[in-house]
Design a protein with these regions (language model features):
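Active-site "cap" helix and flanking loop/linker of ATP-utilizing ligase/carboxylase catalytic domains
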Residues: 66-89, 106-180, 191
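Short, well-ordered beta-strand elements within core beta-sheets of diverse protein domains
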Residues: 51-54, 152-154, 202-210
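A structural signal for short secondary-structure junctions
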Residues: 97, 144-147, 176-177, 196-202
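Phosphate-binding core of ATP-grasp and ATP-grasp-like enzymes
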Residues: 10-56, 67-113
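Generic C-terminus detector
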Residues: 188-193, 197-246
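Short beta-strand/turn micro-motifs at beta-sheet edges
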Residues: 38-40, 140-142, 189-196
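Residue-level signal for inorganic ion chemistry
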Residues: 47, 153, 216
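Single conserved hydrophobic/aromatic residue that forms the stacking wall/gate
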Residues: 1-8, 12
Length: 246
């Protein structure tokens, strides 16, 4: 599959997440997504065709700079202006010679970034979300994550993102893929005859964990090969940036 040059890859956005209570922000891991519809980062932008975590582009120094220069000042300034923010802060970042720069903020977890983060998260998310809602995360420990890599490959309906084909039959998505794979349903429904079919653009999220990005990716694509869905498609190169970095 065609791939952008390594030089171009430095402009790709990374996602850093934080849990905020209006005054404090706890970092909640990072991920790298793939926005373009087709292999080689070609085609139209989408809601996300895949993601993985941890992302090698998130060096400890980059995370520290993003926290000190972007996340904490943003939360503090919003509180000073009488608009304290509680919830998940999604910071879409670009690495530059002058450090991380903000491309966008969202007030939510990303999709499919949330799936890979939740599979790596080693704790109970509920106390953290309650802390955000109640206005105090200061007493909570820093979120802990498993060392494994998790990758998510999105299976979308043909025609996505412009005119996704709905109603096509999906077989094999409900099978047991083993302990290292989870398939999240995003746009599926049951027909009256019980068959599973597509009911949206991004339809399935095939997620797998591994000791490294290569193993996680192999497991995800092995699971995809077991799913019979002629009406769907997926990228075959999710994780290519991490693999290039070794």
């Amino acid at each position: 599959a065609p791939k952008p040059s390594s030089a171009a890859s430095d402009v790709y956005k990374r996602q850093l997440f934080a849990l905020c209570d209006g005054r404090h922000a706890l970092l909640f891991g990072g991920a790298q997504d793939h926005k373009r519809a087709f292999d080689g980062d070609l085609g139209p932008n989408t809601g996300g065709m895949g993601a993985y975590s941890p992302a090698p582009v998130f060096t400890a120094d980059l995370v520290r700079q993003a926290d000190e220069r972007i996340v904490q000042p943003t939360i503090q300034k919003m509180a000073e202006e009488g608009a304290p923010y509680r919830g998940v802060l999604y910071a879409g970042l670009m690495a530059t010679e002058d450090g991380p720069k903000v491309v966008e903020f969202n007030a939510r977890f990303g999709d499919p970034e949330c799936q890979v983060l939740m599979m790596r998260f080693a704790g109970d998310i509920v106390p953290y979300l309650l802390g955000c809602a109640r206005g105090d995360v200061s007493g909570l420990p820093a979120p802990a994550f498993k060392p494994q890599t998790v990758i998510c490959v999105v299976m979308a309906a043909k025609g996505y993102p412009d005119s996704p084909l709905e109603g096509s039959i999906i077989r094999g998505a409900d099978q047991d893929f083993g302990p290292h794979v989870q398939v999240f349903h995003a746009g599926t429904k049951r027909r009256d005859d019980g068959q599973l079919c597509a009911s949206g653009g991004r339809v399935l999220n095939v997620c797998a964990e591994g000791d490294d990005i290569a193993q996680a990716r192999d497991r995800a694509y092995a699971a995809i090969r077991k799913i019979d869905w002629p009406g769907g498609f997926n990228r075959s190169d999710i994780g290519w940036r991490a693999l290039e970095r070794g």
